[in-house]
Amino acid sequence: MIIPAIDLIDGQIVRLYQGDYGQQTTFDLSPQTQLQSYQDQGASWLHIVDLTGAKEPAKRQTALIAKLTAGLNANIQVGGGIRTEEQVAELLSLGVKRVVIGSLAVKEPELVKGWFNKFGSEAICLALDVNINQNGEKIVAVSGWQSGGGKSLESIVEDFSQVGLKHALVTDINRDGTLTGANTALYRELSSHYPHIAWQASGGIATLEDVAAVRDSGAAGIIIGKALLINQFNVAEAIQCWPNE
């Protein structure tokens, strides 16, 4: 499945290079118009990242997300700076279908597991951003990649499988925003080890060949941001390559 994505800082569409706020590109595009275009081309899921909220949780762009969600029929998945049960409940009440939880799942797993029990495993997607070291270990970074986490991807997946983990978005940090192609070996390995989880691939997508490679890796979906913004290909072409389930 193709999941077009936009990242938002202060209401504007941006891209960060490898998660670095110092390497930011701003696009002169309306978030509403952009998401509407993605929906019109056939996207059934859209992914919104609140980068302002990820950096400063007190400045979460909830009002904008509410407006965007209200204007769209597609399913919306939202991440960035979500720290409390109340925030999860608020987003779901606004019509967001799935909330993405990143750093907090690593730092406070028991808290987040409680949310799985309360809201159900369809309503939560874990975002696991990995640094793969020389030994091939997948170490999950936390806090918007600004600091290392030290837990292995596998240990987190095993832990959250106890509460029915169904959706996980995995980004190879070294590929993100680089347009160098996805780490398909990573998604192939995860899909074969944990077939009960719908893996979302993210990072490095540049061409329709990359989309096809991820499709064939066993991943359930692919998050595409930068490639669409710079017109490497469009959503309709991507869906032709990998139709929605």
Curated annotation (Swiss-Prot):
Entry EC number(s): 5.3.1.16
Class of the enzyme per the UniProt entry, highest EC level: isomerase
Primary location class: cytoplasm
Annotated localization: Cytoplasm
SUPFAM superfamilies: Ribulose-phoshate binding barrel (SSF51366)
InterPro entries in the cross-refs: Aldolase_TIM, His_biosynth, HisA_bact_arch, Isoase_HisA-like, Isoase_HisA-like_bact, RibuloseP-bd_barrel
GO molecular function: 1-(5-phosphoribosyl)-5-[(5-phosphoribosylamino)methylideneamino]imidazole-4-carboxamide isomerase activity
Keyword Isomerase: yes
Any GO BP: L-tryptophan biosynthetic process
Reactions it catalyzes: 1-(5-phospho-beta-D-ribosyl)-5-[(5-phospho-beta-D-ribosylamino)methylideneamino]imidazole-4-carboxamide = 5-[(5-phospho-1-deoxy-D-ribulos-1-ylimino)methylamino]-1-(5-phospho-beta-D-ribosyl)imidazole-4-carboxamide
Cellular component, GO annotation: cytoplasm
Pathway assignment: Amino-acid biosynthesis; L-histidine biosynthesis; L-histidine from 5-phospho-alpha-D-ribose 1-diphosphate: step 4/9
Taxonomy, superkingdom: Bacteria
Family in the record: Belongs to the HisA/HisF family.
PANTHER family: 1-(5-PHOSPHORIBOSYL)-5-[(5-PHOSPHORIBOSYLAMINO)METHYLIDENEAMINO] IMIDAZOLE-4-CARBOXAMIDE ISOMERASE (PTHR43090:SF2)
NCBIfam families: 1-(5-phosphoribosyl)-5-[(5-phosphoribosylamino)methylideneamino]imidazole-4-carboxamide isomerase (TIGR00007)
UniProt name for this protein: 1-(5-phosphoribosyl)-5-[(5-phosphoribosylamino)methylideneamino] imidazole-4-carboxamide isomerase
Organism field: Shewanella sp. (strain ANA-3)
